[in-house]
């Protein structure tokens, strides 16, 4: 069985958020860099830095701080997976919480959000939901 890098990112961020840890260490690949860049741009994480440890590159992400213990939990859900790929055209991309959340897609133009896909009128593989 192969590794599902996107599921590993989602699980790492979700577990760090539940345990109220400030930082998440993720293996650096092109896919993870693009997803972390989207999360940074959308405000789900505060900071990202590169880290090298024994010939392996990592991305250390700082999660957004919460003012109270209960608020602002990051919810992530993996949609398309290696055993069941889910594709959508730009007209049928779902809106999460009426547009408050984001959908991350893998398209012919790279990994982008649902808003960018609708503007460029391109569909693709739905990787995950974040709200």
Curated annotation (Swiss-Prot):
UniProt KW keywords: Chloroplast, Plastid, Ribonucleoprotein, Ribosomal protein, RNA-binding, rRNA-binding
Example GO biological process: translation
Keyword field contains Amino-acid biosynthesis: no
Highest taxon above the source species: Eukaryota
SUPFAM superfamilies for this protein: Ribosomal protein S8
PROSITE patterns (UniProt xref): RIBOSOMAL_S8 (PS00053)
Transcription in keyword set: no
Entry GO CC: chloroplast; ribonucleoprotein complex; ribosome
Gene3D superfamilies, sorted: 3.30.1370.30, 3.30.1490.10
Cell compartments where the protein resides: Plastid, Chloroplast
GO molecular function: rRNA binding; structural constituent of ribosome
Assembly information from the UniProt record: Part of the 30S ribosomal subunit.
PANTHER family: 40S RIBOSOMAL PROTEIN S15A (PTHR11758)
General function of this protein: One of the primary rRNA binding proteins, it binds directly to 16S rRNA central domain where it helps coordinate assembly of the platform of the 30S subunit.
Family under the similarity heading: Belongs to the universal ribosomal protein uS8 family.
The protein, known as: Small ribosomal subunit protein uS8c
Species name: Phalaenopsis aphrodite subsp. formosana
């Amino acid at each position: 069985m192969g590794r599902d890098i996107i599921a590993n990112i989602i699980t790492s961020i979700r577990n760090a958020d539940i345990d109220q840890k400030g930082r998440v260490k993720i293996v650096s690949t092109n896919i993870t860099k693009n997803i972390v860049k989207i999360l940074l741009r959308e405000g789900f994480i505060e900071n990202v830095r590169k880290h090298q440890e024994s010939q392996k590159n990592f991305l250390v992400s700082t999660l957004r701080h919460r003012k109270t213990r209960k608020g602002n939990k990051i919810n992530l859900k993996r949609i398309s997976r290696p055993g069941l790929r889910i594709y959508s055209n730009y007209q049928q991309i779902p809106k999460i919480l009426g547009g408050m959340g984001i959908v991350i897609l893998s398209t012919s133009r790279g990994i982008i959000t649902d808003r960018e896909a609708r503007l460029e009128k391109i569909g693709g593989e739905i990787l995950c939901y974040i709200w």
